């Protein structure tokens, strides 16, 4: 019986998928390939159009790979329930659900000290095997509105009378349904995503849409309607309203982080990153680190 148990254990181990290994910088250079994880179907940052990869993060990843003298290999990452899950699945442990793929670099990760230092109930760093670095974008909340039905947005209080569209389960959703003791909840309409909210505004179901600035800029660019305007209102009682977006590598791969950060700074200072954002109608503010 003991021998049978050992044999079963050996067979079980043999049937498990091979654990993906983190490549170091020298191995990546020798392979001539930079594997970069980008979020799937997340316009304007990473998406496919007519079978061709497009988006800000895709173009920036291409520019970084070129600066390192290697080719780009994209890993399309469906967004998980939490960013912690995405970092685990694509940077340090891999997942059988994603074919055991590990990226050398992951785009669109918050560059935030508090998040990087987040600890679990045992006091351990939740993302201790990850280095977050290289801020390349400032992000914030933005409202776009249709001037045919709304003269201006001096305050979010106008959405007590005017319907506004938001993505379901998003920060704007929670904010608009709770601020001012919930007085805006009745006029807050929920949609599967920002494109659907914009389509609803075009159809006259809502007079405005609230989302991240980059997504709003992209939709305004795609809509190409001069009557769709950008609001300049404040968001009282919202908490953090401006944050930076960067990248992530495995904590053992700091050499890659240094090389990528050096390449990124060059691209920012020469205006290449701003040009990439312009391809998709996005405004670009240089992150504080490079000012």
List each model region and its residues.
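A ligand-binding cleft/hinge motif common to bilobed small-molecule-binding domains
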Residues: 109-124, 175-179, 202-203, 207-241
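Extended ligand-binding regions for polar small-molecule ligands
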Residues: 25, 58-67, 147-150, 162-163, ...
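Hydrophobic residues within well-ordered alpha-helices
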Residues: 64, 91, 159, 200-202, ...
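Extracytoplasmic small-molecule ligand-binding "clamshell" domains
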Residues: 21-109
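Acidic, polar ligand-binding/catalytic clefts
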Residues: 74-156
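Periplasmic-binding protein-like
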Residues: 40, 136-144, 213, 221-261, ...
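Bilobed "Venus flytrap"/periplasmic-binding protein-like clamshell domains
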Residues: 38, 54-67, 138-183, 189-192, ...
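Bacterial N-terminal signal peptides
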Residues: 4-16
